[in-house]
């Protein structure tokens, strides 16, 4: 038995300079797990609650001392003495103790930090790397793959202070044979994009996720700049590198008018018009994945978009599904989207995260493992992507150590696993096999 002997919570700082929760779980035998909760900027309305103190005299109200107190008191008292290797039981104890539908008593940030720290401690006690332990928890021991990265190299929307409405323009280095090579291709395109933007007189400051955040004239111009950068780097768009976008449409959807208002371009669209706008972009550029291409509540719009684009484009639900099996189940039954974005802190525990990945895969949906815009040096999502053989990961650009930490962990894992973890490339993307 991997007996829990101590649980410690503390307030640390994330990549945006805001507080977040870090937890340590200590086991008999001296094994320790350490994990931190990430934090989102554009959040789905049905996400589990991230508990903030609201005390304006500390961190502008964003302190997390209440969540930390829950870790150090109620949660610690409930799990000390329990077996850390029973992850589902530990997570359920915390969920039941919280007692709310959205983890609002203790905060998903408190429960998640302990959940992940517990898994890390249990893995250490078994002498396993975290990815191997996650594969065991997932019921797929020894089954691994290296994920295709979606690298967010131009940031807009809520992730940047600019006039670009679409939140993320991403590259996927599909021509790579290994994860390490994919990272190299991404880096080369990133540096060439800096040169392209500079030559056009644009700012090369970066956004929350390490991508550039210039004031471009249109969303199409962002794609044109990326195309030029790919070619300057010596690669062919569509063959070596494909494109993906996160529209984060809920951020520019006007619920009163029912229109998608792209202020950066001075244009507005009905739900169906916006789908056809995206369809035109897909004809002009090799865009193989679109995330949140409609407002999270516009299920009719999503159904139409799935009908129009779903055979050839991966349609990823983020704000739409919020890593929640109840919502995902309904989406699967209604034929909404064909992929889910997986974010630990949207649901708030490792067990529930694994359940969402399994449900998606069983239904023929893909699962894209994702960071949040507020991150730390914690690289657990790298192990999650490999240990569940998810096939795809979204963890930012080629700058900011909070992003690069995940790529570096993937490089280490690939080195350790060798040919036991194949890099699937474009085959991992829905509609591209």
From Swiss-Prot:
Record localization: Cytoplasm; Secreted; Cell surface
Pfam families: Enolase_C (PF00113), Enolase_N (PF03952)
Keywords noted in UniProt: Cytoplasm, Glycolysis, Lyase, Magnesium, Metal-binding, Secreted
Gene3D superfamilies: Enolase-like C-terminal domain, Enolase-like, N-terminal domain
Main localization category: cytoplasm
Catalytic activity: (2R)-2-phosphoglycerate = phosphoenolpyruvate + H2O
Binding-site residues for (2R)-2-phosphoglycerate, renumbered to this chain: 167, 343, 372-373, 394
Cofactor: how bound: Binds a second Mg(2+) ion via substrate during catalysis.
Necessary cofactors: Mg(2+)
GO MF annotation list: magnesium ion binding; phosphopyruvate hydratase activity
EC number annotated for this UniProt entry: 4.2.1.11
UniProt xrefs under CDD domains: enolase
InterPro entries: Enolase (IPR000941), Enolase-like_C_sf (IPR036849), Enolase-like_N (IPR029017), Enolase_C (IPR020810), Enolase_CS (IPR020809), Enolase_N (IPR020811)
Assembly and interaction partners: Component of the RNA degradosome, a multiprotein complex involved in RNA processing and mRNA degradation.
Entry protein name: Enolase
Organism of origin: Actinobacillus succinogenes (strain ATCC 55618 / DSM 22257 / CCUG 43843 / 130Z)
Taxonomic path: Bacteria, Pseudomonadati, Pseudomonadota, Gammaproteobacteria, Pasteurellales
